[in-house]
Protein backbone atom coordinates (compact mmCIF):
# COMPACT_ATOMS: atom_id res chain seq x y z
CA UNK A 1 0.00 0.00 0.00
CA UNK A 2 1.23 3.48 -0.78
CA UNK A 3 1.02 6.57 1.37
CA UNK A 4 -1.18 8.33 -1.20
CA UNK A 5 -4.65 9.51 -0.31
CA UNK A 6 -7.18 6.75 -0.95
CA UNK A 7 -9.71 7.29 -3.71
CA UNK A 8 -13.33 7.08 -2.67
CA UNK A 9 -16.53 7.04 -4.69
CA UNK A 10 -20.24 6.47 -4.35
CA UNK A 11 -21.38 3.03 -5.53
CA UNK A 12 -24.38 0.76 -5.45
CA UNK A 13 -23.20 -2.49 -3.85
CA UNK A 14 -24.84 -5.90 -4.30
CA UNK A 15 -23.92 -8.68 -1.86
CA UNK A 16 -25.28 -12.19 -2.45
CA UNK A 17 -24.73 -15.66 -1.07
CA UNK A 18 -26.28 -19.11 -1.07
CA UNK A 19 -28.64 -20.02 1.77
CA UNK A 20 -27.44 -23.12 3.66
CA UNK A 21 -24.25 -23.46 1.62
CA UNK A 22 -22.14 -24.92 4.44
CA UNK A 23 -24.76 -27.57 5.15
CA UNK A 24 -24.94 -28.49 1.45
CA UNK A 25 -21.13 -28.74 1.30
CA UNK A 26 -21.19 -31.05 4.33
CA UNK A 27 -23.71 -33.32 2.60
CA UNK A 28 -22.11 -33.54 -0.85
CA UNK A 29 -19.20 -31.28 -1.81
CA UNK A 30 -18.98 -32.29 -5.47
CA UNK A 31 -22.70 -31.90 -6.19
CA UNK A 32 -22.81 -28.60 -4.30
CA UNK A 33 -19.85 -27.21 -6.22
CA UNK A 34 -21.39 -28.31 -9.55
CA UNK A 35 -24.65 -26.57 -8.66
CA UNK A 36 -22.86 -23.47 -7.38
CA UNK A 37 -21.03 -23.14 -10.70
CA UNK A 38 -24.32 -23.40 -12.62
CA UNK A 39 -25.96 -20.79 -10.39
CA UNK A 40 -22.94 -18.49 -10.46
CA UNK A 41 -23.13 -18.46 -14.27
CA UNK A 42 -26.69 -17.10 -13.89
CA UNK A 43 -25.70 -14.55 -11.23
CA UNK A 44 -22.55 -13.40 -13.03
CA UNK A 45 -24.41 -12.99 -16.31
CA UNK A 46 -27.14 -10.83 -14.73
CA UNK A 47 -24.52 -8.63 -13.06
CA UNK A 48 -22.52 -8.20 -16.27
CA UNK A 49 -25.64 -7.63 -18.41
CA UNK A 50 -26.62 -4.76 -16.12
CA UNK A 51 -23.23 -3.00 -16.15
CA UNK A 52 -22.09 -4.39 -12.82
CA UNK A 53 -18.62 -5.56 -11.84
CA UNK A 54 -17.89 -8.39 -9.43
CA UNK A 55 -15.00 -7.24 -7.28
CA UNK A 56 -14.78 -10.04 -4.75
CA UNK A 57 -15.96 -13.59 -4.18
CA UNK A 58 -15.42 -16.05 -1.36
CA UNK A 59 -16.91 -19.52 -1.50
CA UNK A 60 -20.59 -18.97 -2.26
CA UNK A 61 -20.61 -15.19 -1.84
CA UNK A 62 -20.42 -12.51 -4.52
CA UNK A 63 -20.01 -8.77 -4.05
CA UNK A 64 -20.48 -6.47 -7.03
CA UNK A 65 -20.54 -2.75 -7.72
CA UNK A 66 -22.83 -0.76 -9.96
CA UNK A 67 -22.73 2.90 -10.93
CA UNK A 68 -26.52 3.01 -10.61
CA UNK A 69 -28.90 1.55 -8.01
CA UNK A 70 -31.36 0.92 -10.85
CA UNK A 71 -28.90 -1.42 -12.55
CA UNK A 72 -28.18 -3.18 -9.26
CA UNK A 73 -31.84 -3.89 -8.48
CA UNK A 74 -32.54 -5.00 -12.06
CA UNK A 75 -29.59 -7.43 -11.88
CA UNK A 76 -30.74 -8.79 -8.50
CA UNK A 77 -34.33 -9.32 -9.66
CA UNK A 78 -33.13 -10.87 -12.92
CA UNK A 79 -30.88 -13.45 -11.33
CA UNK A 80 -33.30 -14.29 -8.51
CA UNK A 81 -36.00 -14.91 -11.13
CA UNK A 82 -33.63 -17.05 -13.23
CA UNK A 83 -32.41 -19.03 -10.21
CA UNK A 84 -36.06 -19.67 -9.28
CA UNK A 85 -36.74 -20.95 -12.82
CA UNK A 86 -33.67 -23.19 -12.62
CA UNK A 87 -34.82 -24.56 -9.27
CA UNK A 88 -38.25 -25.39 -10.70
CA UNK A 89 -36.60 -27.67 -13.26
CA UNK A 90 -34.09 -29.34 -10.87
CA UNK A 91 -34.18 -32.13 -8.36
CA UNK A 92 -34.43 -30.82 -4.79
CA UNK A 93 -30.79 -31.65 -3.99
CA UNK A 94 -29.67 -29.53 -6.98
CA UNK A 95 -31.62 -26.43 -5.95
CA UNK A 96 -29.95 -23.35 -4.51
CA UNK A 97 -31.42 -20.15 -3.17
CA UNK A 98 -29.63 -16.84 -2.86
CA UNK A 99 -30.22 -13.94 -0.54
CA UNK A 100 -29.26 -10.45 -1.66
CA UNK A 101 -28.40 -7.20 0.10
CA UNK A 102 -28.21 -3.85 -1.68
CA UNK A 103 -26.67 -0.63 -0.39
CA UNK A 104 -25.69 2.76 -1.75
CA UNK A 105 -22.68 4.23 -0.06
CA UNK A 106 -19.15 5.54 -0.17
CA UNK A 107 -16.43 3.01 -0.83
CA UNK A 108 -12.65 3.20 -0.93
CA UNK A 109 -11.00 2.02 -4.14
CA UNK A 110 -7.84 -0.06 -3.71
CA UNK A 111 -6.77 -1.63 -7.00
CA UNK A 112 -9.69 -3.72 -8.26
CA UNK A 113 -11.20 -4.08 -4.79
CA UNK A 114 -13.58 -1.87 -2.82
CA UNK A 115 -13.67 -1.40 0.95
CA UNK A 116 -15.62 0.53 3.52
CA UNK A 117 -18.97 0.94 5.15
CA UNK A 118 -20.77 0.92 1.78
CA UNK A 119 -19.65 -2.68 1.27
CA UNK A 120 -20.07 -3.76 4.89
CA UNK A 121 -23.66 -2.53 5.10
CA UNK A 122 -24.61 -4.44 1.93
CA UNK A 123 -23.18 -7.64 3.43
CA UNK A 124 -25.04 -7.13 6.73
CA UNK A 125 -28.30 -6.46 4.90
CA UNK A 126 -27.81 -9.57 2.77
CA UNK A 127 -27.53 -11.76 5.86
CA UNK A 128 -31.00 -10.64 7.01
CA UNK A 129 -32.74 -11.34 3.68
CA UNK A 130 -34.94 -14.40 3.36
CA UNK A 131 -34.11 -17.22 0.93
CA UNK A 132 -34.74 -15.97 -2.59
CA UNK A 133 -35.19 -12.44 -1.25
CA UNK A 134 -33.68 -9.02 -1.78
CA UNK A 135 -33.20 -6.53 1.06
CA UNK A 136 -31.97 -2.98 0.59
CA UNK A 137 -30.82 -0.14 2.78
CA UNK A 138 -33.01 2.91 3.26
CA UNK A 139 -30.46 5.00 1.36
CA UNK A 140 -30.63 2.61 -1.61
CA UNK A 141 -34.44 2.59 -1.53
CA UNK A 142 -34.66 6.39 -1.32
CA UNK A 143 -32.38 6.74 -4.32
CA UNK A 144 -34.57 4.33 -6.32
CA UNK A 145 -37.63 6.43 -5.51
CA UNK A 146 -36.05 9.45 -7.17
CA UNK A 147 -34.35 7.73 -10.11
CA UNK A 148 -36.99 5.26 -11.28
CA UNK A 149 -40.19 7.00 -12.26
CA UNK A 150 -43.31 4.88 -12.23
CA UNK A 151 -45.06 4.20 -15.55
CA UNK A 152 -47.69 6.75 -14.49
CA UNK A 153 -44.99 9.40 -13.86
CA UNK A 154 -43.35 8.66 -17.20
CA UNK A 155 -46.73 9.13 -18.90
CA UNK A 156 -47.22 12.51 -17.20
CA UNK A 157 -43.78 13.75 -18.21
CA UNK A 158 -44.22 13.15 -21.93
CA UNK A 159 -44.15 16.37 -23.86
CA UNK A 160 -46.82 16.88 -26.50
CA UNK A 161 -45.40 16.91 -29.99
CA UNK A 162 -45.35 20.28 -31.65
CA UNK A 163 -47.25 20.81 -34.88
Predicted stretch roles:
Residues 12, 94-108:
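A short glycine-enriched loop-to-beta-strand structural element that forms part of the catalytic core
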Residues 146-151:
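Conserved small/polar residues in nucleotide/adenosyl-binding loops
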Residues 109-127:
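Catalytic-core segments of nucleotide cyclases and related cyclic-nucleotide turnover enzymes
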Residues 121-138, 142:
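Catalytic/regulatory signature loops of cyclic-dinucleotide turnover enzymes
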Residues 2-75, 81-82:
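Catalytic NTP-binding/metal-coordinating core of nucleotidyl cyclase/transferase enzymes
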Residues 84-92:
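Active-site phosphate-binding and catalytic loops of NTP-dependent enzymes
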Residues 157-163:
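Hydrophobic alpha-helical segments, chiefly the membrane-spanning helices
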